[in-house]
Every structure is written in structure tokens, then in C-alpha cells.
Amino acid sequence: MAGETVITIVGNLTADPELRTIGSGVTVASFTIASTPRTWNRQTNQFEDGQALFMRCSAWRDLADHCAQSLKKGMRVIATGRLQQRSYQAQDGSQRTVVEMQLDEIGPSLRYATAQVTRQSSGQGGFQGRSGGFQGGQQPNQGYGNQGGQGGYAGGQGGYNGGYQGGGAGYSQQSAAPANPSAPAVDPWSNAGASDAGSFSTFGASSDFGGDDSDPEF
């Protein structure tokens, strides 16, 4: 939620988690994490422990069950959560206020130890469900890539070939368009076509080269 203080703490459990069930049937695990800072002493050339911070933590529902099954006294953990302040009435009747950390995540620190994670039944079900959904997503994808994609590509080739052939036919029609089949072809060397050429049909006579008309033509 907005406005909440989220922190991360690294430390050791001071005792085993205490698991209890509240009136609504929800399980809650409570324990304390001791976070001790270490500083370097230049005089002794050694690390020294500073003042420890004891943070009271609470985990709810499935996280509470997992903490009770996994965490033990002295284990070094990394926890993240939200700081919350609550008030309660002590056994002596006094009213007290404490600041607690409501955990969102917690796990073992691997800096000085190793750990092996074992999934619970609820976690396995959710993981397998995600795997099944992933496989289900692969099948439509494969069908689209192999069948739908190839079909579309073949259709594209057909359209390309059809367009290319159609374009070739159109190009042939444009080439034949200037020819008029009803009009005869004009022969520029014939007398019929000499109306616009004048004496072009008599070109080559002796008079054209300065000779007499009685001279034989070439």
C-alpha cells in the first residue's frame, strides 16, 4: 500500500518461529531477527560487533507455515517487509506499543551457508499450471508459424505471380494500341503516299542530278 515503510533486514533468528492460529482460522508465525552490524576496528585490525537490532517479525498464511517448517534458531535470513505499529494491553494491564515487520518475503542467506529449496504441493501445482499454459501457448504459435505463415507466403507468391503476369499482358496491350486494324499501312515509297511528299516519289531521276530528261534513269 502507498505510504508504508518497506525495509530489508539481514540477521539471525533468536528462536524458533512460533506458529499459532487466530480466530478466523488464519495461521501466523512470529519470531525475532537480530541484525548485528560489524565494523572494522583500525586499532585492533579486527571486525567488531556493533549494537544489535532486534526486529519482531510476523508472517501470515502460507508464508507462516513455510517459516515454521523451514526456519530454526540461529539461521541467518534475509527478510523484506513493511513496518507496522500496533498497540496491545499487557498482562499487567498496561498499554504498550510495538513496531513490527510484516513479512512479504524471507529466505536463507547463502553467504555463510548453502540451502536446498523444496517446493510444496501448492507451489508445484502453480508451477505446473504455468508450464502447461506455456506449452499451450507454443502450439498455436507453431501452427501459425508453420502453417499459417507458409500459407500466407504462398498466397503472397501467387499474388505476385498473378500481378506480374497481368502486368505483362497489360504491357502487350499498350504496345499494340497505336495500331489501327481498319486502316491500311502507309508506304512512304509508294505514289499513294506522295500527296504530302510532293515529288518525293520521283526522287532519283536524271534531272535531279543535273542531267537531261533523255538520259536513262538509274
From Swiss-Prot:
Biased composition (Low complexity): 171-185, 192-209
Entry keyword set: DNA-binding
Annotated Gene Ontology cellular component terms: nucleoid
Domain SSB: 1-110
Name of this chain's protein: Single-stranded DNA-binding protein
CDD domains for this protein: SSB_OBF
Domain of life according to the entry: Bacteria
Xref: InterPro entries: NA-bd_OB-fold (IPR012340), Primosome_PriB/ssb (IPR000424), ssDNA-bd (IPR011344)
One GO BP annotation of this record: DNA replication
Disordered: region residues: 115-150, 166-218
Presence of keyword NADP: no
Pfam families: SSB (PF00436)
PANTHER family xrefs: SINGLE-STRANDED DNA-BINDING PROTEIN
The keyword DNA-binding belongs to this UniProt entry's keyword annotation: yes
Compositionally biased spans, kind Gly residues: 123-136
